[in-house]
Curated annotation (Swiss-Prot):
Family: Belongs to the krueppel C2H2-type zinc-finger protein family.
GO molecular function, one term: DNA-binding transcription factor activity
Pfam families: zf-C2H2, zf-C2H2_6
Gene of this entry: Znf367
Coiled-coil intervals, chain numbering: 299-332
This protein's UniProt keywords: Activator, Coiled coil, DNA-binding, Metal-binding, Nucleus, Phosphoprotein, Repeat, Transcription, Transcription regulation, Zinc, Zinc-finger
Source species taxonomy: Eukaryota, Metazoa, Chordata, Craniata, Vertebrata
UniProt protein name: Zinc finger protein 367
Modification type Phosphoserine: residues: S300
Its job: Transcriptional activator. May be involved in transcriptional activation of erythroid genes.
């Protein structure tokens, strides 16, 4: 055979030739116009194949899932999308098929983790009530928006320092202490001296002195007890906590060598006994507030008066309605002489 002469084309070329790999064959099948690589003569080195074979509408990292990680830098994210929305050139990371034993790409991991963060940020457990009022401590990145919203709000429950508005007067009073640094609720346990912004924080803190653990794991047979309602059982992390009143053996007969501490404990349980009928009546009417929303329990001084808040909102709506009716009546009176 003469060097440089073209190969005879007497027979159609086979499907696999010139040491083609299965990967190259797959791309050749996808191509709309298959390209037949030329056979080289004896002794002449085979020209290297193109690094990334392409075809109309497809790219190499889409055809071969095991190369997604190599092309992660080619994936672009839409600006402003918190979860990482993948551009039109690549399907969403959660929709991409996975191969057994193939590690996930950095793009898919970023998209999935971003989606989880969004879901956690917008979850219903973040503190929404049936009446539509948000409860609990707001997220740090929303405080500035709340302040800007309060500057244009007609609510009378407004902080005179930062212009934030609140749905309840007690929430406003607790918020003002963040500006003044006031901590009016002092723990009187011997040698403690800690002070708190809300009374709910003081009550929760005093359980450390009394040894109370009123919250128990709801899993059958589990004896784990907790001081706070926002804890999770290490053995059953998905089980809810339920409240049980402390028994005599757990708390009331707690022994201590300190005489002052013993007197404080005796006084504490005496006051608890006096408040017991009132507390039981409240527990029958509604579930424990701290277990429903621990963050709001720590922020509020006492149990919020939902009825008075609803009446106040209703009164504001009536005032707006009366104002609108007065404007309509005034417009009718001024327009009557013109029509005559």
């Amino acid at each position: 055979m003469i060097r440089g002469a073209p190969a005879p084309m007497a027979e159609p070329p086979p499907v696999i030739f010139c040491h083609d790999s299965p990967k190259r064959v797959l791309v050749s099948v996808i191509r709309t116009t298959p390209a037949t690589p030329p056979c080289s003569s004896v002794g002449e080195p085979e020209p290297p194949p193109p690094l990334v074979p392409t075809s109309p509408g497809f790219s190499d990292f889409m055809v071969y899932p095991w190369r997604w990680g190599e092309n992660a830098h080619n994936v672009t994210l839409s600006p402003g999308a918190a979860g990482g929305v993948v551009s039109a050139g690549l399907p969403a990371a959660t929709e991409l098929p996975t191969l057994r034993g193939a590690p996930p790409s950095s793009a898919s991991v970023a998209a999935v983790s971003g989606g989880e963060d969004e879901e956690e940020a917008s979850s219903p457990d973040s503190g929404h009530l049936k009446d539509g009022i948000r409860r609990g401590r707001p997220r740090a990145d929303t405080v500035r928006d709340l302040i800007n919203e309060g500057e244009h709000s007609s609510s009378r429950i407004r902080c005179n320092i930062c212009n934030r508005v609140f749905p309840r007067e007690k929430s406003l009073q607790a918020h003002k202490r963040t500006h003044t640094g006031e901590r009016p609720y002092l723990c009187d346990y011997p040698d403690c001296g800690k002070a708190f912004v809300q009374s709910g924080q003081l009550k929760t803190h005093q359980r450390l002195h009394t040894g109370e653990k009123p919250f128990v794991c709801s899993e059958n047979g589990c004896l784990s007890r907790f001081t706070h309602a926002n804890r999770h059982c290490p053995k059953h992390p998905y089980a809810r906590l339920k409240r049980e009143e402390p028994t005599d053996t757990l708390s009331k007969h707690q022994s201590t060598d300190n005489k002052a501490a013993a007197e404080w404990l005796a006084k504490y349980w005496e006051m608890r006994e006096q408040r017991t009928p009132t507390l039981k009546g409240k527990l029958v009417q509604k579930a424990d507030q701290e277990q429903q929303d621990p963050l709001e329990y720590l922020q509020s001084d006492e149990e919020d008066d939902e009825k008075s808040g609803a009446q106040r909102r209703l009164q504001e709506q009536r005032e707006r309605l009366h104002g609108a009716l007065a404007l309509i009546e005034l417009a009718n009176l001024t327009g009557a002489p013109l029509r005559q």
